[in-house]
Amino acid sequence: LKQRRRMDQLVKDKIDSGIKNNDVCLFMKGTPDAPQCGFSMTVSNILKMLEVNFKGVNVLENQSIRDGIKQFSDWPTIPQLYIKGEFIGGCDIVKEMYESGELKTKFTSSGINVKS
């Protein structure tokens, strides 16, 4: 049990690090260049269309990260987008925000460059 708790802390620290060390962090299935699910591809493509620099974390490479990010955010699905440490949401929310212009506003108000 003690080792499991320690492992959970290591996973939490790794997730924390990804979020804190990158202004925009996307926990996704696959990579930005080779997404492994349609939802991850959608969010990755939106970020690319906005020309936002982002860190893609492939949850398929680590089952504990895949499970841990869901607990970390209290959100049941992947992908998950974080901007400046704030959890934004999954595919549906990001897509709606993109279509309404709210996502671009969120980036600019957070000091993140986007395509004009």
Where do the model's predicted regions map?
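Non-catalytic, surface beta->alpha helical segment in thiol-disulfide oxidoreductase systems
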Residues: 83-115
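Acidic beta-strand-to-loop metal/phosphate-binding motif
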Residues: 27, 80-84
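Thiol-based oxidoreductase modules, predominantly thioredoxin-like and allied folds used
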Residues: 48-66
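Eukaryotic intrinsically disordered and solvent-exposed regulatory patches
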Residues: 11-13, 66
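Thiol/disulfide oxidoreductase modules built on the thioredoxin-like
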Residues: 71-77
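Local sequence-structure signature of Cys/Sec-based thiol-disulfide redox active-site neighborhoods
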Residues: 16-53
